[in-house]
Structures are given as C-alpha cells and as structure tokens.
C-alpha cells in the first residue's frame, strides 16, 4: 500500500500530466517533457488606455501543450486571510493553449483599471505575472509635461503627492475615476494630497485634474506591498522593489541625481547560497529624471548570453535574477544606476556553495495526528528542507462510490492547498469550522526538480457527546493518579522520617585523619594485547608510567611523569637518519609530517626514501600518547599488505615518539576524486582547474575493490576500523588505495565487537545505526561505512546526506531512510550499497563477499570514460531492466526503506505510462 501511495503522489505532484477525469473516466495521458521556465519574462505589459478604448494583455508560455492558464484581477477592496488582495477569476482554467495567450479588454470603463494577473501551472510548478491597466477619462490636447510616476510604498508609509500647477486651489484628486474625499487619514491641501498609514486598498492610479475641466495634469501609479527583503528569494513572488521615494517624497519631482531608496536593504554584500538556488540582487533607487540601471560581473558588462540559463533583468524593479546558480556564477556583481545628473554603483559578492542535489526532506513526525471538536479549528504543520525551490501541496484522501481506492488500487484525493515554499504559510494547513466530513487522512507532498517526498497524518473529529465522555474518563484517571501519588509521597516521607530518627540515635563516627598519605606506584598505562602473527609476534611491550598518588580527596598533584618505552630492535630506526619536512595534516591527537629516511629500506640501505611521520602535538595529553602507542603496537602485528598503510619504523629513544609509515603522494581519496571531476559537473570542486586525469568507470570500481581488499585483510586480523571513509583512504603515486588512520581502530581477539563507552567526536554520517545509537562496533558496522564510502566514490567525492542536520539524520535513519543511487553508478553496484546499509547487521555482506562481487564487476567492464550527462546503466553487465530501479536518474539524497523486503518503486517515466490519477479540485 505504501508503494501505491508513493506512485500516486508522484503523479499528483507533476500536476496531473497523466490524469484521468473522475466523472467521465476517460484517460488523457501524455508524457511530455516540461521546461523549468513556465512564463516568458516581460509579459503581460502595463498599459494606459482612455475610457471606451481597447487593450490586449498578452501572456507567453514556454510549453503551451503541458501548461494550464487562468486570468485574474486583483480586488484591492477585499483582502484574503493572508492580508493580500483577493483574486477574482476572469476566465476558467484554460488548456490546450497556443504559445501566446491574449486576454482582451474592450470598451474599457474606469472600473476596469487595476492589476491583472496571469497565472500558469504545469508539472514544474506555478508562475504568476501581472500588469497594471491605467484608465484615463480624458486627456487634454496638450500633452502633460511630466511623465506618469510609478511609486511603491510599504504598509504604514505616508504617501504625499504634489500636482504642479499655477492654480493649486482648483485641483481635484481622483483614484481609478472616483474622486478622493478628504477624511481623517487623507489630507488634501491645495495641490498636495497626503495619505497617512497606507494600506493595500490605497494601491491604484491617482490623477490630479483642474476643477471644472477634464484636463489630467498628472497621474501616479501607486503600489502598496509588504516590506521586501534583499535576500535570494524566488522570482515568482509578484513583489516589487521600491522604486519610489520613502516617507517624505516631495523632492522626487525635482531634478536630482540618482540615490538609493533603501540602503538598509543593501547592507548584505556577501551571498553564500547552495548550488541550484535562485539568487536576486536588488539596487532600489530613484532620481529625477528616472535613472536607468545596468549590471556588471567582475567589472564587465553582464548580459543573458554570458550565462547558461540566462538572467532576468527587471529594470523597473531594480533587480537581477539568476535561477539555478552553479559554481561558475561566483563573482562580483555591480549595479550602476545613472541619469544625466550623475551615477551611483553598488557591488555584491556571490559565492555558490557546492551541494549534491536532493529532493525535499520532510521533518520527521510532521504533520502530526490531530483531534478537533465539531465547529472548532485545526491545523497541520509540514516542515520542508530543500536546496532547490520546492513546490508544496496538501491533499485529502476521499471516498468515491463508497471506496477510497480506484479499480487500479490508487487512492482518491483532492487538493486542498498548493503553493511554493516562499509563499505565506504554505507549510501550514488551516482548517476552520470543522465538521464530521473533514475527518480523515491528510498528506503533505513536497517536490522539486529532483524528486518528491510526502508524509501523512489523520484528523479525528469529535462531537460534543464524545468530548463529554472523554472528560469523564480523564477525571477518573486523574483521581486515580492523585490517590497513587499521595500514597507514594506518604511512603517517601515515612522513610525519610525513619532515616532521620536513626541518624539521631546513632550519631556519625568521627572522620578519619585526612592527612594525605603519599605513596609511589608504578603501573601499566595500558594493557597490551597480542595477536598471533608470523611477522611480529614478539610485539607485546608494556608502557609504564611513574606517578605520585595521594589518598586524599584533593586532585592529583602536578608531579613529574616518566614514561618508559622499551627498545624494539625489529622496528627502531635511528633518529639521526631522519630529516623532517613540511606538515601533511593534523589528527585528533597528533600531526603528520613528510620526512626523508635514509636507509629505512632494508634491501637498499643507501637509498633515501620519502615517509610520513606521525607524532604528538605540543599540547598532547597522556591519553593522546597512549592512543598513538596503541596504534603503533597494532600496526606492528599487521603483516605487509598492499591496500593498507604499513608501518616502516619507530623512534622511541632519546626524544619524542615518532611513528614512520608509508607516504601516499596523491593525498586522500576524497580530494583525489574531487580534483578529477569533469568540468561540466554543476558542482565541480574547482571550476577553473582542468582534471589531472580523466577517470573511467572502471577506475571508480577499482577504487572500491582495493578498499574492500584492505578491509578484508583488517577483518581477518580481527581489527575493527570504526572510521572508514574516503578521507581516511590514501592514494599513492601509482593510484594504489591504502587504508589509513588506525587512531580509532581497536584490535579484538576473544570478542567480535567493541562497545564505545566514552563521549567523543564521532563520524556520524558514516556510522551504522547500532554504532550510532547503541555504541556497538563490529565488522558489520565497518561494512555499513564501506557502503557510504562507495557512495562517495561514485559521486566523485560528494558529501553524504548534504544539508541534513545531525539531529534530523538520527530520525531519518531510524525511520529507514537511505541515500538514493548516485547518477554515476549502476543499478547493480547501488544494490551492493543498499545491502551494506541493511538495518540488520547480520544481513549485510562480509568484506570477503564484497571483494568477490567487485572483482567480478571489475573483470566484466571496459575502460570507458565518464559521461555524467547520461545515466550509467550502459556500463552495467547485468542490469537489463533499469525501469525497475529503486531510484530515478536524478541524484537525490534519500530513499525510504521501511521494510527490507519492500518492492522497488516504479521510476517516474514508468508511472506516467502505467498509472492514472484520480483527483477532484476543491
């Protein structure tokens, strides 16, 4: 049933592209690719027309065949629940449109003046664009000297308009053809009209005329809107930037050089946004005459053809809009505003943060089940996390002909609310004056260009009789609780009284002499363990610490501590033959530096070899030293292996402890992959850098295979790594993968798991659920981490669970969510990742099985270079039917695996070809 609901919601979110009428039952399915853009910018256009004239409003569509459109007019005299003007529908919902849609206005009257809205929707979402129609009763034969002024004010501002004339006492003011009357809020003094505390109803066209004539001296288009921030909000909010004056705007009509109207909104100069977001830069300004604006990028003129995906230059709104930004959009963006009296400029810095794309994530536990009383109110909350702009719908499951499901098993629903994330309170569904018919299941559906997610909750409606019964039951329950609580408190008080009485009868003994007794003890700092090994079975040295202990309760005195490290001839390397070089990195308890070791190669004593040296920091503690020694001793008992970092020698005498290990010249696997990403990837690590080598798909499989071999060897030595990740795998000059960082590793001999009991920083995004929640570490928990490492490999160094807070990750893992298939991965290899992420540890494969499977895949593929523009199914030797994959072609973050035996969901394109949706519109 869960799979059916997911299939149904996928169709619903794509706006009924393949829908079926409930009444007629006739299908009209058509699989159409839709553009991310819906309406062409710049349409419809503002118009000014005389009474009795005609005008055509034009809306241009990008994909008319898959788009539905409707025309509205804003009624500024009526406000909706969110405080915005009510939209009055002028046409029904239009379908099967041409590329250009025209709404004609004929025989225009003064009542036709106002704002007209073109609203379109398709599977990509919704878009609205509007235009003002200004209606003039009559104009004088002589043209007015001043042009029409367009002003935008915020709620609560003061509007002051001046009409330039020699006869100020003979001026009358009209709004949309109706004379403006003087009242407590509107003051008309001679040729000046002042409106205090403006509201939405004050929006419109104002005209000043000479009394007794029909000569329009001047007209003003006024728009009142909410305060508009200068963040990177969506472009489809129908908001306008302030292009007019502030509270006192008398001086706007005199000659003046450009100036900023809202400098406080331009204080934020650095924008750091995730890739895929929409960015809007604003430079609200004015002047007289009205200035023009142009945009520069890094000091050069910036036009739409300079950027893939184009730009939107909304000059009348003083804004630059860029959709779906990528790292190549980074740079300095400057607006230059100028007229004949001067020019001003302002610069923004844009930094696009690298993110792997993902579908929306819904906060766990929301929406919640709700109970309401008949006639009361209720609300559902749905918290959405999404880098790309999401579209949200609220659905109610309904019954048709006595059934909640159609003949094909898909449930019936109706849409009760829809909108984008930046619309007012779209994440909240309000239900008022509830009746019994409102009871049922409600779903929150959120989707973006990558995919969709949904969660449901139930509304229970109680009658007054049900409420009375509930109250009686609660009162009875509370009575029982009070009785039991009173009895418990009485028992506790009795025990306390008895204890106090006994203390009075038997007074406490005199305390012992608390003089500190000093003694000297010598004890092992850490118990050493041995593992049977042909090469290093003699390594069982004890580390001793000498310290002064006090028997008093005061802290241990700061005395000299002496550590005794025994000399090991098999591993000791002369300190004078070692030349330290530049640092390579820092760990949790020490640092690693590059060094040259003379004679460390026993086969060639005269050879100078490059090594990596692990050592402690200056502020290291006893525990840090013990951890480094533990790692050293663990590496001693390991045989040489090609896919692990091997120990070469140690320096324990006459100086600080040095641990000499193999040097890997190409650094960590994570940075190795990132540095070799193709330049065409939207989230390339460095867009200016040409990859040193072009990786093949076989190279990626080889990386996973080599790491699996190294982990198979560690598992055979009963060693649990606990921090397996791409950052802890090093790459040599010959592209050999070597597992490193045994700082968190623990040897196991008689038990097969290690349970962590101390608190510390742990790699939570790589940890298995049993390690994360129960602190139990096994070889199977390392297998889980290996699955995450495979995901890193096939995303070329991507970050797991991008943009998900750690607290939210805990909930998602408990609910069974798993990461989706990377776009550069075959179905077969993704299934191996999913096996590694099995909720039951014993059901995960062993490293030996993983080595065998990856070896088989490696043998069956050829050296083909990566092409990230196409899916990787072509490289799969065994996955013939890709349509049944558990993930879409897009690279999203999560898929849900509530049950291990849950069947795979159909892909999106298969859904459209096989299923129909039954919906009704409220």
From Swiss-Prot:
<feature type="modified residue" description="Phosphotyrosine; by autocatalysis">
    <location>
        <position position="754"/>
    </location>
</feature>
<keyword id="KW-0597">Phosphoprotein</keyword>
<feature type="glycosylation site" description="N-linked (GlcNAc...) asparagine">
    <location>
        <position position="401"/>
    </location>
</feature>
<dbReference type="InterPro" id="IPR007110">
    <property type="entry name" value="Ig-like_dom"/>
</dbReference>
<dbReference type="GO" id="GO:0070857">
    <property type="term" value="P:regulation of bile acid biosynthetic process"/>
</dbReference>
<feature type="disulfide bond">
    <location>
        <begin position="163"/>
        <end position="208"/>
    </location>
</feature>
<feature type="domain" description="Ig-like C2-type 3">
    <location>
        <begin position="258"/>
        <end position="351"/>
    </location>
</feature>
<keyword id="KW-0677">Repeat</keyword>
<dbReference type="InterPro" id="IPR000719">
    <property type="entry name" value="Prot_kinase_dom"/>
</dbReference>
<feature type="glycosylation site" description="N-linked (GlcNAc...) asparagine">
    <location>
        <position position="332"/>
    </location>
</feature>
<keyword id="KW-0732">Signal</keyword>
<dbReference type="InterPro" id="IPR013783">
    <property type="entry name" value="Ig-like_fold"/>
</dbReference>
<feature type="glycosylation site" description="N-linked (GlcNAc...) asparagine">
    <location>
        <position position="219"/>
    </location>
</feature>
<feature type="topological domain" description="Extracellular">
    <location>
        <begin position="20"/>
        <end position="480"/>
    </location>
</feature>
<keyword id="KW-0812">Transmembrane</keyword>
<dbReference type="GO" id="GO:0005886">
    <property type="term" value="C:plasma membrane"/>
</dbReference>
<dbReference type="InterPro" id="IPR008266">
    <property type="entry name" value="Tyr_kinase_AS"/>
</dbReference>
<feature type="topological domain" description="Cytoplasmic">
    <location>
        <begin position="502"/>
        <end position="922"/>
    </location>
</feature>
<feature type="glycosylation site" description="N-linked (GlcNAc...) asparagine">
    <location>
        <position position="433"/>
    </location>
</feature>
<feature type="glycosylation site" description="N-linked (GlcNAc...) asparagine">
    <location>
        <position position="107"/>
    </location>
</feature>
<feature type="active site" description="Proton acceptor">
    <location>
        <position position="723"/>
    </location>
</feature>
<keyword id="KW-0472">Membrane</keyword>
<keyword id="KW-0967">Endosome</keyword>
<dbReference type="InterPro" id="IPR050122">
    <property type="entry name" value="RTK"/>
</dbReference>
<keyword id="KW-0808">Transferase</keyword>
<keyword id="KW-1133">Transmembrane helix</keyword>
<keyword id="KW-0832">Ubl conjugation</keyword>
<feature type="glycosylation site" description="N-linked (GlcNAc...) asparagine">
    <location>
        <position position="96"/>
    </location>
</feature>
<keyword id="KW-0675">Receptor</keyword>
<dbReference type="GO" id="GO:0005524">
    <property type="term" value="F:ATP binding"/>
</dbReference>
<dbReference type="GO" id="GO:0043235">
    <property type="term" value="C:receptor complex"/>
</dbReference>
<feature type="domain" description="Ig-like C2-type 1">
    <location>
        <begin position="27"/>
        <end position="134"/>
    </location>
</feature>
<feature type="glycosylation site" description="N-linked (GlcNAc...) asparagine">
    <location>
        <position position="422"/>
    </location>
</feature>
<dbReference type="InterPro" id="IPR011009">
    <property type="entry name" value="Kinase-like_dom_sf"/>
</dbReference>
<feature type="modified residue" description="Phosphotyrosine; by autocatalysis">
    <location>
        <position position="865"/>
    </location>
</feature>
<dbReference type="GO" id="GO:0005783">
    <property type="term" value="C:endoplasmic reticulum"/>
</dbReference>
<keyword id="KW-1015">Disulfide bond</keyword>
<keyword id="KW-1003">Cell membrane</keyword>
<keyword id="KW-0418">Kinase</keyword>
<dbReference type="GO" id="GO:0070374">
    <property type="term" value="P:positive regulation of ERK1 and ERK2 cascade"/>
</dbReference>
<feature type="modified residue" description="Phosphotyrosine; by autocatalysis">
    <location>
        <position position="753"/>
    </location>
</feature>
<dbReference type="Pfam" id="PF07679">
    <property type="entry name" value="I-set"/>
</dbReference>
């Amino acid at each position: 049933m869960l799979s059916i609901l997911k299939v149904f919601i996928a169709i619903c979110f794509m706006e009924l592209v393949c829908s079926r009428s409930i009444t007629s039952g006739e299908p009209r399915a058509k699989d159409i690719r839709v553009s991310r853009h819906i309406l062409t910018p710049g349409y419809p256009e503002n118009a000014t027309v005389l009474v009795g004239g005609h005008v055509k409003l034009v809306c241009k569509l990008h994909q008319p065949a898959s788009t539905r459109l409707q025309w509205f007019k804003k009624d500024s005299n009526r406000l909706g629940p969110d405080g915005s003007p009510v939209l009055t529908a002028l046409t029904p919902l239009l379908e099967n449109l041409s590329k250009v849609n025209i709404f004609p206005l004929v025989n225009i009257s003064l009542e036709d003046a106002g704002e007209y809205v073109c609203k379109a929707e398709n599977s990509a979402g919704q878009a609205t664009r509007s235009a003002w129609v200004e209606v003039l009763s009559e104009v004088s034969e002589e043209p007015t000297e001043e042009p029409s002024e367009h002003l935008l004010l915020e709620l609560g501002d003061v509007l002051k308009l001046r009409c330039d004339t020699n006869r100020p006492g003979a001026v009358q003011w009209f709004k949309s053809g109706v004379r403006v009357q003087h009242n407590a809020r509107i003051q008309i003094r001679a040729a000046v009209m002042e409106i205090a505390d403006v509201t939405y109803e004050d929006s419109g066209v104002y005209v000043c005329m000479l009394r007794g004539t029909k000569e329009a001296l001047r007209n003003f288009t006024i728009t009142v809107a909410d305060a508009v921030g200068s963040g990177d909000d969506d472009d489809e909010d129908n908001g306008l930037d302030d292009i007019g004056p502030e509270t006192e705007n008398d001086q706007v009509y005199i000659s003046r050089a450009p100036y900023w109207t809202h400098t406080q909104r331009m204080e934020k100069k650095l924008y750091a946004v995730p890739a895929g977001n929409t960015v809007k830069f604003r430079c609200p300004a004015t002047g007289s005459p009205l200035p023009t604006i142009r945009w520069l990028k890094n000091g050069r003129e910036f036009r739409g053809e300079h950027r893939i995906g184009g730009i939107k230059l909304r000059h009348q709104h003083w804004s630059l809009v860029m959709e779906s930004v990528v790292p190549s959009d980074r740079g300095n963006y400057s607006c230059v505003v100028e007229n004949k009296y001067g020019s001003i400029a302002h610069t923004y810095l844009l930094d696009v943060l690298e993110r792997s794309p993902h579908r929306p994530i819904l906060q766990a536990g929301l929406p919640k089940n709700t109970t309401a009383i008949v006639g009361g109110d209720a609300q559902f909350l749905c918290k959405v996390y999404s880098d790309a702009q999401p579209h949200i719908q609220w659905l109610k499951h309904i019954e048709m002909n006595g059934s909640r499901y159609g003949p094909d098993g898909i449930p019936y629903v109706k849409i009760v609310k829809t909108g984008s994330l930046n619309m007012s309170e779209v994440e909240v569904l309000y239900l008022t004056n509830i009746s019994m018919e409102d009871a049922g299941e409600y779903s929150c559906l959120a989707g973006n260009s990558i995919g969709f997610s949904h969660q449901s909750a139930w509304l229970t409606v109680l009658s007054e009789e049900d409420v009375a019964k509930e109250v009686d039951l609660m009162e009875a329950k509370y009575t029982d609780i009070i009785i039991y609580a009173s009895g418990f408190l009485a028992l506790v008080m009795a025990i306390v009284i008895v204890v106090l009485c006994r203390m009075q009868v038997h007074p406490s003994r005199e305390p012992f002499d608390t003089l500190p007794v000093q003694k000297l003890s010598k004890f092992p700092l850490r118990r050493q363990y041995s593992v049977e090994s042909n090469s290093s079975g003699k390594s069982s040295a004890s580390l001793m610490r000498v310290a002064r202990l006090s028997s008093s309760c005061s802290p241990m005195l700061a005395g000299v501590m002496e550590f005794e490290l025994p000399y090991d001839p098999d591993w000791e390397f002369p300190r004078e033959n070692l030349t330290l070089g530049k640092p390579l990195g820092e760990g949790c308890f020490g640092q690693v530096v590059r060094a040259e070791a003379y004679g460390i190669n026993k086969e060639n004593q005269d050879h100078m070899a490059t090594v990596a040296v692990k050592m402690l920091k200056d502020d290291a503690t006893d525990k840090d030293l013990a951890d480094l020694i533990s790692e050293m001793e663990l590496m001693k008992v390991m045989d040489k292996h090609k896919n692990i970092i091997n120990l070469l020698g140690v320096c324990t005498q006459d100086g600080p402890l040095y641990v000499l290990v193999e040097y890997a010249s190409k650094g960590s696997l994570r940075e190795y992959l990132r540095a070799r990403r193709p330049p065409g990837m939207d989230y390339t690590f460095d867009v200016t850098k040409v990859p040193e080598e072009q990786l093949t798909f076989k190279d990626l499989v080889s990386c996973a295979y080599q790491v699996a071999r190294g982990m198979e060897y560690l598992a055979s030595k009963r060693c649990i790594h606990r921090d397996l990740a791409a950052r802890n795998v090093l790459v040599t000059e010959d592209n050999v993968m070597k597992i490193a960082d045994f700082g968190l590793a623990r040897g196991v001999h008689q038990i097969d798991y290690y349970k962590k009991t101390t608190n510390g920083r742990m790699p939570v995004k790589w940890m298995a659920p049993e390690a994360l929640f129960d602190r139990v570490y096994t070889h199977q928990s390392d297998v889980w981490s290996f699955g995450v490492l495979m995901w890193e490999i096939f995303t070329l160094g991507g970050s797991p669970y991008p943009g998900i807070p750690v607290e939210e990750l805990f909930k998602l893992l408990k609910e069974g969510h798993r990461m989706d298939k990377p776009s550069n991965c075959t179905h077969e290899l993704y299934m191996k990742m999913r096996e590694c992420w099995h909720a039951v540890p014993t059901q995960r494969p062993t490293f030996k099985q993983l080595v065998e499977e990856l070896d088989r895949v490696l043998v069956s593929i050829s050296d083909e270079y990566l092409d990230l523009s196409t899916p990787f199914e072509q490289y799969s030797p065994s996955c013939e039917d890709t349509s049944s994959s558990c993930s879409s072609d897009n690279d999203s973050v999560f898929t849900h695996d509530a049950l291990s035996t849950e069947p795979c969901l159909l892909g999106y394109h298969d859904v459209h070809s096989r299923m129909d949706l039954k919906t009704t519109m409220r």
